Every structure is written in structure tokens, then in C-alpha cells.
Amino acid sequence: MAKPSLMTASPKKALSKELMKRVKSAVRFSYAPYSKILVSAGLYCASGKIYTGVNIENSSYSLTMCAERIALFKAVSEGEKKFRLLLLYSPQLNFIMPCGACLQVLSEFAPDIIIVLMNENDELKFYPIKTLLAKPFTLVSSKS
């Protein structure tokens, strides 16, 4: 019997074996000499295209870039505007969660995106972004 999830039918269809395979394959490009934690992400767009990203660390830690934002920035720089789900994977950590910065950036571009966590055994956990970041920061325009 299948476990219930927080996903709707449409994003479930988007979570293909192809997406899972590409995300697992991409992790080898991760550059993590400091934390030793390899992370990869796959962003599935409404166009059907998949964009992958990996974490890229820097000795000046604040300049490190997470896999989620790299995947998103690649997609946006190629003209993508609608995003269905983001798959996140780390072989070292069981169900790695996105950081707050990534959730904030993702919420601006895709306020209804589904975040999918995958472990080494291809087990999945599904979270609407709003369950992970209920109240994202927004600038409120003020009239002078």
C-alpha cells in the first residue's frame, strides 16, 4: 500500500525516474572540500525541462552556493518562469533539508513549488514549500 504524501497528482507525475537519475548523477560534480557534504538538486519546470545544480563551497564560507539556488538560477537564466518541483539529494545525509536562504529564494520564484527529499535508497519525502517556510520575507511597497 502506497504511503500518503503531501503531493498532488500533477507533481507526482513530474517525479520521474529520469529526474531521480539525473539528480543522483549530478552529485559527483559537487565541490565540497570543507564540509565534505555533497548535495545535488533537480528543478522540474512546467516546460518539462530539468535543470540540475550542485553545492559549490568556498573557503570564504558565506560565498558558498547551494545546489537548489544553482538549479534555480540556471533555469531562470535560460528563460524558465514556472516550476513544479525541486528534488534534493545528498548521499551523506538522509533526507537533507533546504536551508532558509534557498527556501526564501525559491518562494519568490515558485510560491507553490513542491520540495522533494530523496535518500540513498530512493525513498522520498514531499513538502509544499509553504510547510517549510510559512511566511517568506517580502518587500512591501510604501507610498510617500
Would you name each region that the model predicts?
Residues 44-46, 55-56:
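Histidine- and/or cysteine-centered catalytic micro-motif in compact active-site loops
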Residues 23, 41-42, 71, 75:
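Small-residue (primarily alanine) positions within well-ordered alpha-helices
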Residues 49-50, 124:
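Hydrophobic "anchor" residues
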Residues 66-87:
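Short, solvent-exposed cationic patches
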Residues 36-45:
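Short beta-strand scaffold segments in enzyme catalytic cores
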